[in-house]
Amino acid sequence: MAENKRTRWQRRPGTTGGKLPWNDWRNATTWRKATQLLLLAMNIYIAITFWYWVRYYETASSTTFVARPGGIEGWLPIAGLMNLKYSLVTGQLPSVHAAAMLLLVAFIVISLLLKKAFCSWLCPVGTLSELIGDLGNKLFGRQCVLPRWLDIPLRGVKYLLLSFFIYIALLMPAQAIHYFMLSPYSVVMDVKMLDFFRHMGTATLISVTVLLIASLFIRHAWCRYLCPYGALMGVVSLLSPFKIRRNAESCIDCGKCAKNCPSRIPVDKLIQVRTVECTGCMTCVESCPVASTLTFSLQKPAANKKAFALSGWLMTLLVLGIMFAVIGYAMYAGVWQSPVPEELYRRLIPQAPMIGH
């Protein structure tokens, strides 16, 4: 009687029960969460500093002055998109909110190379959404999964929002964008954004509350269905050379990769993950118990040869390196801060609630 052949597989080095300990330097999830917390802390600092800067002008200089944080430009994606159109047409950096455009370009480059890594490694909204989802999972023991007939149309909403903003940017001539960026509204655009959060109306409060509650039950509700920024990164990420790739020969069909994927991608059924929903978070890679089976790489992993694959520490180095390189360029070029005279800020910021488009 012929002896049945058993599939032999090699356990991923350092794993216990198929997982690496959280404090193992090879654990990609630990590197990602550390990067997320760093960016979240930076954005909290930016928000607090910006609030103090605005209050200085609102109180007629009676409070402590702090310099305007240039990082607030990262919260002006529409200005960044419009300025990107202006720069592509004219070949020049915009005079106001150039940093918003450069940060947008940095995040596009990250998505172009590393899938939607901006969403899962850098975005503070994505981090908060993930934390809320984790809380919901601990409180209720599970996450809701919407049926396909509802999930697919809802995922299309963020692309409709993205199309609207791209249409606005494409519709405006470069000269019109230039004049708009010099307008009083553009100068205090960041202050208007702060006012939106400081003085929420009833409808906005209800919407935010519903979204927060939904995020407890539906993982990444905002990111999956409504975020136009993530939609843009997803479209760009289709060109990414790095993808999650699976070696079907060594795969033991345990299904852990698909079960743990926060985007609910059936990784265990695919040879390479092309979908716009993949954020490059590497959760599936960390869930795989078999060596050389699931990688975030340029080519399919193989048991008999080493393919170049991205590790957690290298992903951290790349996403932070690209972002800080662009910030460094903005500082070197003198556009990290918009060249707005202090007297103009002194006059416009107290009037910001009354300034329209």
Curated annotation (Swiss-Prot):
The residue stretches assigned to a coiled coil in this entry are: none
Which parts of the chain does the record assign to the membrane side Periplasmic? 55-91, 182-195, 333-357
Q: Which residues form the 4Fe-4S ferredoxin-type domain?
A: 242-270, 269-299
Q: Which UniProt keywords apply?
A: 4Fe-4S, Cell inner membrane, Cell membrane, Electron transport, Iron, Iron-sulfur, Membrane, Metal-binding, Repeat, Transmembrane, Transmembrane helix, Transport
Q: How does it sit in the membrane?
A: Multi-pass membrane protein
One GO cellular component, as annotated: plasma membrane
Subcellular localization is given as: Cell inner membrane
Residue ranges annotated as transmembrane are: 37-54, 92-114, 159-181, 196-218, 310-332
Gene3D superfamilies per UniProt: 3.30.70.20
InterPro entries from the entry?
4Fe4S_Fe-S-bd, 4Fe4S_Fe_S_CS, NosR_regulator
UniProt-annotated binding residues for [4Fe-4S] cluster 2: C261, C278, C281, C284
What positions does the entry give for [4Fe-4S] cluster 1 binding? C251, C254, C257, C288
Q: Per the record's keyword annotation, is Transmembrane helix included, yes or no? A: yes
| Main location per the UniProt record | membrane
Q: Which GO terms describe its molecular function?
A: 4 iron, 4 sulfur cluster binding; metal ion binding
Specify the superkingdom: Bacteria
* Topological region Cytoplasmic: 1-36, 115-158, 219-309
What is the protein name stated in its UniProt record?
Putative electron transport protein YccM
Organism, scientific name: Escherichia coli (strain K12)
Q: Give the source lineage, highest ranks first.
A: Bacteria, Pseudomonadati, Pseudomonadota, Gammaproteobacteria, Enterobacterales
